[in-house]
Amino acid sequence: MRALLTAISAPGSSAVYCTVGDLDWWRYNDEPEAIALAHLWFTGDLLIGVAWPKNDQVDLLTHPHHRDIEASMVSWAERARRARAGAGGEALPLRAWTYDGDVPRTALLQAHGYARTATHFRYHSRPLDTPIPALPVPPGYTLRPVTGTADIEPRVAVHRAAFAPSRMSAARYHRLMGAPTYRADLDLIVVAPDSAFAAFCIVWFDAANRLGVFEPVGTHPAHRRRGLGQAILYEGLRRLRQLGARTAYVNSYGGDEAAERLYTSVGFQLVDRNYAWEKLL
C-alpha cells in the first residue's frame, strides 16, 4: 500500500488524496482492526487500488495509471456498505470523496447517483525552495520535539483540548509513535511557562517524493492568539526543508476560517477542495 501511495503522490500529481504520512495517521489513530476492512485491487503483483470504508464513507485510493478501476471500486463500496448494515431495509447513506479538480472521479460519482454535500476539506500546498523565516515563541514558551514516551500524557492532553471531543488516548499515541513514517524530530510541541503543552503538530515526511504533510496541527484554547501556531508551522517547514523536502501540504476543514488564516499566514496556498459526495443506497 505504501508503494501505491508513493506513486499517487509522485511529483507532478494534482491534489493528493492520501500520502504515506496520511496513511500512518489514519491507520494508527484508528482501531488496530480498522485496516482489515480495506479492499485491494491488483494487476498482476502490482497494487493499483484501495477502497477503505469506515462507517458511512469510503476513501478511494487509485494508481494514476489505472483510474479505470474506480467504477468497480464504487460498486464494491456500495455492496460493502449494505453488507455492514445487514438486513433492515432503511436507506443507507454512503459518502465518497473527490476534489473539484478531479474531473473523472466527479463524473463517475455523478453517474452513480451521488450528489455533492457541503462537507469538504481545503487542500493547501507550499513550496520549500526558499529559506523559511524563524518566528520565536513568546517569552516563557519553548518549542521542541517530543522526547519519547514521557511526553505522551501531556501530548494527549493538549490534543484532546484542541480537538474536543477527541478519541485520542495514551494507548493510541503510543501506537502512533510506532508508525513507519513517524519521526520524533518532526513531532513538535510548544511548552507553556507552567510546563503544560500549549501547541503541537506532527509532520510526516515522504522521502521518496520529497514532500511533507502536517497532520494534525492544534493549539490549546487557553493559549490561542499568541502566534504559537505560526511558530510551530514555521519550525516544521524549516525541518522539512533541511531534510530535502520540496513541498509541504496541509488540509483544513471547510468553514474553519481560523485554520485557513493560519495556514495562509505561513505561505500555504489553496490548491483544491475535497468534497464529500453522498448517495442513499
Describe the predicted segments one by one:
Residues 162-208, 217, 221, 230:
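Phosphate-binding active sites in nucleotide-utilizing proteins
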Residues 47, 54-139, 275-279:
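Acyl-donor-binding surface of acyltransferase catalytic domains
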Residues 5-87, 95-98, 193, 198-211, ...:
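Conserved donor-binding loop and adjoining core beta-sheet/short helix segment
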Residues 67-83, 219-221, 225-242, 247, ...:
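Conserved acetyl-CoA-binding loop-helix of GNAT-fold acetyltransferases
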Residues 173, 233, 256-259, 278-281:
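Short glycine/proline-centered loop/turn elements that form peptide/ligand docking sites
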Residues 105, 109, 263, 268:
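Conserved active-site tyrosine of GNAT-family acetyltransferases
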Residues 94-97, 214, 248-252:
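Conserved hydrophobic beta-strand within the GNAT/NAT acetyltransferase core sheet
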Residues 1-23, 134-168, 196:
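Short amphipathic alpha-helix that is part of the acyltransferase structural core
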